[in-house]
Design a protein with these regions (language model features):
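Hydrophobic beta-strand segments of well-ordered beta-sheets in folded domains
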Residues: 272-274, 321-328, 353-356
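Hydrophobic, Leu/Ile/Phe/Ala-enriched alpha-helical segments that form helix-helix packing faces
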Residues: 170, 261-265, 291-295, 313-316, ...
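Helix-rich interaction surfaces within compact, conserved domain-sized segments
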Residues: 333-361
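Extended, compositionally biased accessory segments flanking or bridging domains
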Residues: 2-28, 32, 232-300
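A short linear-motif detector with a strong N-terminal bias
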Residues: 252-255, 302-307, 334-336
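Short acidic, S/G/P-rich loop/turn micro-motifs used as interaction or catalytic elements
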Residues: 280-283, 330-336
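Phosphate/adenylate-binding glycine loop and adjacent helical scaffold
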Residues: 1-233, 237-240
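Conserved helix-adjacent loop modules within structured domains
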Residues: 49, 54-57, 65-68, 74, ...
Length: 361
């Protein structure tokens, strides 16, 4: 059993491979499974709105765009305080937590403004005070390495002129010492103190810089990923559907772990019959988790989304087209994600797979 569950590593790429140097090990980590630091609420004034905007409440997305260039802002927990007449329209005075979700390039002098809720366009209005504006990034809480040996080695990799791709990472290990996850990390040491876990061990607090990437394209694992990692620490799962209780972030984390644990196949199976357990396929992530387990077993990898599935169907991932796939309880996916299921079915049939969709009797 591996006592140290994390490794701090320097890495760089060569023409042929990736070189990894383990510089320190830690028994545990605190602050890794986190969302960005919440942003402060602020006043939001939407100018020239349809009158029905007076009744807005909840979470929204604001798009400020010129042609194909846009900024998307999340307006979280928006509360309307009142309205002011503006010709035939109204100005809406509200409060919300405002955070950039995505950004395009430079803007022209007269951007248009659209408001959305759950991808549904609610309407266009004339402007939002202070938007578009620069964004300085998502703030992240510090990460603490617990029980570190050799804390003096926890420092950023020195930049070398001949290295074009390099960096620092945190590797999570399972109980057998296999690297099961890799997370980019900044090694900006804020403090080092003796650890209560034993003599010669230290707790190291690492400040983390802001990131401009939206949280949905996170490098950091989501809070719900912790339970997924805990399960995988015992080794690659040997049972199907252990991912089913997890939310979307947890299922995403599960798919990420399958990719790093993917097997190397010397040859592919051709022909045969496989069954998808479709009872828990309620979103596109779970579709791929269930399909992967059907084709290459629990914890197996055969793509995390439809483009990766298309690549796997070319061969080299354990199973090649020419087989029969029986999809049990297909109505679950048919009700939840009909369009995505249809794309997957069409792709597999185009590749010569005999696919039979079965509904629960």
């Amino acid at each position: 059993v591996c006592l140290f569950r994390y490794e701090v590593v320097h890495w760089h790429e060569t023409d042929d491979d990736e070189v990894v140097e383990v510089v320190a090990r830690a028994i545990d980590v605190d602050g890794l499974f986190n969302d960005p630091v919440p942003v402060a609420r602020e006043r939001v004034v939407l100018r020239g709105c349809p009158r029905e905007f007076a009744d807005l409440a909840g979470d929204f997305a604001l798009e400020v765009c010129v042609d194909d260039e846009a900024q998307w802002w999340d307006l979280t927990d928006l509360v309307v305080h009142g309205t002011v007449p503006n010709a035939e329209l109204v100005d809406v005075v509200a409060s919300a937590a405002v955070r950039l979700d995505d950004a395009g390039s430079a803007f022209g002098p007269a951007p248009r403004h659209l408001l959305f809720r759950d991808d549904e366009q609610l309407g266009e209005f004339l402007g939002a005070d202070g938007l578009p504006r620069p964004w300085h990034g998502h703030e992240w809480p510090p990460i603490t390495l617990i029980g570190v040996e050799h804390p003096e080695r926890v420092r950023p990799m020195r930049q070398c002129s001949h290295l074009y791709t390099f960096g620092d990472r945190l590797h999570a290990l399972d109980r057998h010492g296999r690297v099961m996850a890799k997370v980019p990390i900044a090694l900006d040491t804020a403090s080092v103190t003796p650890s209560a876990l034993g003599d010669g061990l230290f707790d190291v607090v690492l400040d983390q810089p802001p990131t401009r990437e939206p949280p949905r394209r996170r490098d950091r694992p989501a809070p719900s990923a912790r339970a997924v990692w805990d399960l995988w620490r015992e080794g690659v799962p040997a049972e199907r559907n252990l991912w089913a209780p997890f939310d979307d972030d947890g299922r995403e984390a599960w798919g990420d772990l399958t990719y790093l644990a993917r097997k190397r196949f010397e040859s592919d199976e051709v022909g045969g019959r496989y069954e998808v357990d479709g009872r828990y396929v309620t979103d596109w992530r779970s579709l791929h988790l269930a399909l992967n387990e059907a084709l290459v077993g629990p914890g197996g990898y055969y793509g995390r989304e439809i483009n990766a599935l298309q690549d796997c169907l070319h061969g080299g991932w354990g199973v090649k087209p020419g087989f029969t796939l029986v999809w049990k309880d297909a109505q679950v996916a048919g009700d939840a994600i009909p369009g995505y299921l249809r794309q997957v079915v069409e792709l597999m049939r185009e590749r010569g797979i005999t696919l039979r969709l079965e509904e629960k009797a």
